[in-house]
């Protein structure tokens, strides 16, 4: 089941470093260096093989394209890792900008600055074949009965509550790595992810993973 509520993937800007056609000299954390953050880990298809420096994957390629427009050569780009929660919390950051499929919300816009969206995606239900074999179906009535998990810091939580309203409150985790680990441990039945990430997780990360 795909939930066609659009989740905007955006660049999170932590400083005033990115400005179209503007000189970046003196506007980055380290002079002459553009520091870009990604997730830990960074998932396919956004970053291939968790290696953003390879320039392979949608967000890795976007990052180097932005760097080139700002006048930074590839060897002047450095990468750091942040959790989703660290990226959207108030306070000093260790990056110039961050690409991690952020959804834009009014609450987040009060804390950080976003670029225009560079990608929009449907949301998908990630589960396992065992849950489907036990009778789970792609209907709201069936989805309500499942045990859900979610990253507490993502828009998956309000989407679950508003669109599905599960019979049991979703179990909340620190990040999506913990969510998929909980699914593998059979602590939860299902979780919401953007469609590209859900396809990757079902094929590579979660044994016998499936989309419902």
Model feature map: region roles:
Residues 14-19:
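N-terminal signal peptide c-region/cleavage motif recognized by signal peptidases
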Residues 129-147:
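Flexible hinge/capping segments at coil-to-helix
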Residues 72-74, 92-100, 146, 184-197, ...:
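Alpha-to-beta junction loops
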Residues 49-52, 63-75, 140-142, 155-174, ...:
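Ligand-binding cleft/hinge of the Venus flytrap
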Residues 77-89, 134-136, 171-185:
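Short helix-initiation/N-cap motifs at beta->coil->alpha
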Residues 113-127, 163:
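Short Pro/Gly-enriched coil loops immediately N-terminal to beta-strands
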Residues 22-101, 110:
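Extracytoplasmic small-molecule ligand-binding "clamshell" domains
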